[in-house]
C-alpha cells in the first residue's frame, strides 16, 4: 500500500511538473499584431510571386479565460491557381503565456481538401489531446492521446519560438517538442542555425535575424520542413520563411507589420 501511495504521489508530481513547464514568458507580441507576407515559388531557378499570407494575433476569451487567438491564412493568386491551388487557414488559441488550448487547420492544396482539429485538456493525470482529421470525403479519423510533455501545434509553436532567447543558443542546438496535428502527435525538433543578416530585395530592408529550422522525422531520417528568420530584437518578428515542399521550394517575405508590441 505504501509503495502504491508513493507511486501515485510521484505520478501526480510528474504531471504537475510537466504542466508547470508549459507556460512561457511572452514579451515579443500582444493582441493587435498583424503581419502580411508575399509568397514566392521557385520554377526553373526563377522566383515568381504566387500569392500572399497574413498572420494576425488578437487577445480574446476561450471558454471564459483570457487567451490569444492567432491565425495564419495563405492564398495563392489566380495565376498560381492554374498550376496549384493553395488556400490554407490555421487558427490556434493559447493562454496568455502560450499554453495551447485549441487548434484547427482547413487546407485546400491542389485537389486535396483536409480538416484538422486538436483540443488540449490539462489535468492532474497529464495532457490529453482530442485529435480529429478528415481528407476530402473520407471518413473522419478521431484519436485521443495522453502525453507527459507539453505539445504544440504549428502556430502555437511559432508563437513560443518568438520568446526564445537567442543569446542562450549555440549553432546546432536542438529544441525537442511534441507536434500535435489532426492525425497524430509526434516528437519533432527545431534546430538553431545561428545569426544572419537578411536583406529583403522587395522592400530593400535589412534585418539582423535569428535563424531556426523546423525538422521533421521520416523514419530514421530527418527532413527540413521550414526555415524561419526572426528579428534579433524584442519583437522576434518572422520576416522570412523558406518552405521545402514536395513539389519544389517556396519563400515568404514580410511585407508589412502593424501593431507590434515593442516600438
Locate predicted features.
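Bacterial N-terminal signal peptides that target proteins for export
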Residues: 1-8
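N-terminal signal peptide c-region/cleavage motif recognized by signal peptidases
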Residues: 15-17
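Acidic, serine/threonine-rich low-complexity disordered tracts
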Residues: 21-122, 164-263
Amino acid at each position: 500500500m505504501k509503495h502504491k501511495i508513493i507511486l501515485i504521489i510521484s505520478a501526480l508530481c510528474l504531471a504537475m511538473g510537466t504542466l508547470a513547464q508549459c507556460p512561457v514568458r511572452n514579451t515579443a507580441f500582444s493582441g493587435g499584431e498583424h503581419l502580411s507576407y508575399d509568397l514566392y515559388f521557385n520554377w526553373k531557378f526563377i522566383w515568381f510571386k504566387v500569392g500572399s499570407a497574413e498572420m494576425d494575433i488578437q487577445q480574446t476569451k476561450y471558454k471564459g479565460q483570457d487567451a490569444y487567438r492567432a491565425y495564419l491564412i495563405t492564398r495563392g493568386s489566380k495565376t498560381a491557381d492554374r498550376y496549384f491551388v493553395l488556400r490554407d487557414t490555421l487558427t490556434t488559441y493559447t493562454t496568455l503565456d502560450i499554453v495551447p488550448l485549441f487548434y484547427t487547420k482547413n487546407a485546400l492544396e491542389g485537389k486535396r481538401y483536409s480538416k484538422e482539429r486538436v483540443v488540449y485538456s490539462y489535468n492532474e493525470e497529464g495532457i490529453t489531446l482530442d485529435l480529429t482529421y478528415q481528407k476530402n470525403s473520407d471518413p473522419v479519423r478521431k484519436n485521443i492521446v495522453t502525453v507527459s510533455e507539453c505539445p504544440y501545434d504549428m502556430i502555437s509553436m511559432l508563437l513560443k519560438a518568438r520568446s526564445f532567447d537567442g543569446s542562450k543558443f549555440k549553432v546546432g542546438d536542438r529544441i525537442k517538442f511534441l507536434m500535435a496535428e489532426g492525425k497524430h502527435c509526434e516528437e519533432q525538433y527545431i534546430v538553431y542555425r545561428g545569426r544572419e543578416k537578411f536583406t529583403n530585395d522587395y522592400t530593400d530592408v535589412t534585418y539582423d535575424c535569428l535563424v531556426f529550422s523546423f525538422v521533421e522525422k521520416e523514419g530514421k531520417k530527418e527532413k527540413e520542413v521550414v526555415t524561419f528568420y526572426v528579428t534579433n530584437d524584442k519583437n522576434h518578428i518572422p520576416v522570412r520563411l523558406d518552405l521545402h515542399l514536395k513539389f519544389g521550394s517556396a519563400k515568404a517575405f514580410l511585407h508589412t507589420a502593424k501593431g507590434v508590441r515593442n516600438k
